[in-house]
Amino acid sequence: MGQQEAQQVNAQLPMVQDAQIQNYVNALGNRIAHLTSRADLNWQYQVVNSDVVNAFALPGGFIYVNRGVLERASNMSELAGVLGHETEHVVRRHSVKQLEQAQGANVGVGILCALTGVCQSGVAQAAINIGGTAVFAKFSRTDEIQADEGGFNNVMRAGISPRGMYTFFQKLLAEEQSSGGGGSAAAWFSDHPGTQDRIADIQRMLNQVPASQLNSLQVNDAGWATMKARLARLGPAPRAPAQ
């Protein structure tokens, strides 16, 4: 499960057209995923050309992260926190549960506008208008807590600091509050419920790790600055339509 849905998504979503950016994110994701219990999957991490701050996972190891996440992330560990979280949704089969609930709906149409704000066809917009996206766009609060806990452990196992997960979520929360709920991070809070409580849970997990161990974990890597420089040289991403 997941291959057919990924093909639908790839046919609809505009991807970032820079091989080095795509390769960097895919390598970082695989660094994390290959140390989980589902190292057997053919994990694929792709960057969607959307300024909306969001990411999503399909069964089988297909992870999509929006360009907006890369632009907001200040270091590799912040991006790794998002990838570790989405990876855990696959490990725990949360995405399988969503697809089973969908009962054969068109996934490529179903998640396109809700998660990226980018519609490549009138059909996709029509699906949004009739509410066809809800089953794909949201995991339960319990699913999100499990993905946070597993994602925290996933990045640590890969030798990456889990502080990035905490600082990235804090950054998005501050942006959301300052914008009055209408910023480009709004999709994250819509699709990832209970963020404030989850930030507190991540802080609790951080407090349980010795400071010396946290300080020994990686925050950046050799490719981060190059990836960000290439990202800055891209043309503007398609903007989400005004709500």
What are these regions (language model features)?
Residues 1-243:
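A Zn2+-metalloprotease active-site environment signal
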